């Protein structure tokens, strides 16, 4: 028998959260969500102690015009992944509060936590 524990159902990798610009209270989050189960996983919300509001958004280009729309519900396919990246799906983190060296994010489905993510900002160059 294998001595390893089973993989968690949902995993976040390549996490990057931008530090808000001085005087601004908004940030963006990028990551890859991987579903290790045989069933799709729904995500219908996100929260953070360091931001008053977190939304999932998607940037699309129509007729040469870039538009951003909110994603009400995201489905991570069974044994698949979804990428949040610049110019595509991303997290909008708004109303920064108590922002220090790290950010904790929670992803939700029907009011139940699906995944918790801790992200530490890289040290700023001197």
Residue ranges of each PLM-predicted region?
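Bacterial signal peptide processing site
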Residues: 4-6
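Compact, glycine-rich, soluble single-domain proteins
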Residues: 9-126
């Amino acid at each position: 028998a294998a001595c390893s524990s089973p993989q968690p159902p949902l995993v976040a990798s390549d996490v990057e959260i931008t530090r808000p610009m001085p005087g601004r209270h908004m940030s963006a989050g990028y990551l890859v969500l991987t579903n290790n189960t045989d069933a799709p996983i729904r995500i219908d919300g996100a929260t953070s102690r360091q931001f008053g509001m977190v939304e999932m958004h998607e940037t699309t280009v129509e007729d040469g015009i870039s538009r951003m729309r909110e994603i009400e519900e995201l489905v991570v396919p069974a044994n698949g992944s979804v990428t949040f990246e610049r110019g595509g799906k991303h997290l909008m983190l708004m109303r920064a509060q108590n922002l220090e060296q790290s950010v904790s994010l929670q992803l939700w489905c029907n009011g139940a936590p699906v995944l918790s993510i801790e992200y530490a900002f890289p040290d700023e160059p001197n």
